[in-house]
């Protein structure tokens, strides 16, 4: 049985989580924790958040029965939670709206963020434009190449995009640079972390803002079918879209829960981003969790066709859910994700993000082992517009 009161007062999910940061950041994190504790149950704050999610983000978004996909596969009925229909095209805005409202109440004038696929950067730049914050987004130079359209969107929204050329030039390096910035500008700056990783209180706070996904999906599935789903499936990079769907179902033992990591070119090749499946516990970006690292504890380079899953760690709550066995973690490789990307597009007229395609791919495998009376909710965490250049290049087409 999952204890719903996690994390504890120190930000621990069992042996994971915590606040492993330089002394210079402790007071900023404590200030943030105090503000979040104050406002998370404040009716004015929650009312404003609800209004923004409804009128600006476009919630609730639908739970869509993918009839044609389900029929083609045979087996369980697949339902898609349509986070791709949110303003900005992914689940990321659920969290950035929440953190922006908190930053406003804390009197901050500047927001910073890290981004991989660019979706969190776009969602942060969007709320910065809306609420009048100065905005700086750190992005690995490798990801800037892969996600040029999102880079332009951020600049259009008024954000400064800073290329990060250290390390593997991807998400983990962008996170390092953002943390360095925050240390230097703690008085006026709010760091909007995009996933359920990082030091306490971020894993809890981001989970709480993303839990709207599961709250809605649960009610929508009950309304459509009169019962709970048999399984949930979501992709896991840092893990915020997944924990958002999973959290409201954790105590429902009849619901099987699957997190899907990026298997890249195959786990056996070492070129992947599956930290829960192939990693071991360690400390990265302020929290203890599962990491991909070598025998000397150095963080390994990761690979995925999807920039948003290309991260060597994972949120600490996922590490805890793996160890307790409540969530089962699987890997889907690049080619399987691309096949699912094409199949969903062809059968339903919905172009998913490559991240979400990993979840769709595993749901397809799972559905085949289940009966037609059973159902699976897949978190369609984002739309695939941002991935057109990547998929076209794989197909040998230049656009």
From Swiss-Prot:
Catalytic activities: (1S,2R)-1-C-(indol-3-yl)glycerol 3-phosphate + L-serine = D-glyceraldehyde 3-phosphate + L-tryptophan + H2O
Protein task? The beta subunit is responsible for the synthesis of L-tryptophan from indole and L-serine.
Q: Which PANTHER family match?
A: TRYPTOPHAN SYNTHASE, TRYPTOPHAN SYNTHASE-RELATED
Q: What class of enzyme is it?
A: lyase
Gene name of this polypeptide? trpB
Give the family per the record.
Answer: Belongs to the TrpB family.
Mind telling me what this protein is named?
Tryptophan synthase beta chain
Q: Which cofactor does it need?
A: pyridoxal 5'-phosphate
Q: In what pathway does it function?
A: Amino-acid biosynthesis; L-tryptophan biosynthesis; L-tryptophan from chorismate: step 5/5
Superkingdom in the source lineage: Bacteria
Subunit comment: Tetramer of two alpha and two beta chains.
Q: Whose protein is this, by species? A: Legionella pneumophila (strain Corby)
Q: Which Gene3D superfamilies match?
A: 3.40.50.1100
Q: List the disulfide bonds.
A: none
Question: What are the protein's GO molecular function terms?
Answer: tryptophan synthase activity
Q: Which residues carry this modification: N6-(pyridoxal phosphate)lysine?
A: 92
The alphabetical list of record keywords is:
Amino-acid biosynthesis, Aromatic amino acid biosynthesis, Lyase, Pyridoxal phosphate, Tryptophan biosynthesis
Q: Which HAMAP family match?
A: Trp_synth_beta
> Record's InterPro entries?
Trp_synth_b_CS, Trp_synth_beta, Trp_synth_beta/beta-like, TrpB-like_PALP, TrpB-like_PALP_sf
Q: What is its EC number?
A: 4.2.1.20
Q: Does the keyword Signal apply?
A: no
Q: Which GO terms describe its cellular component?
A: cytoplasm
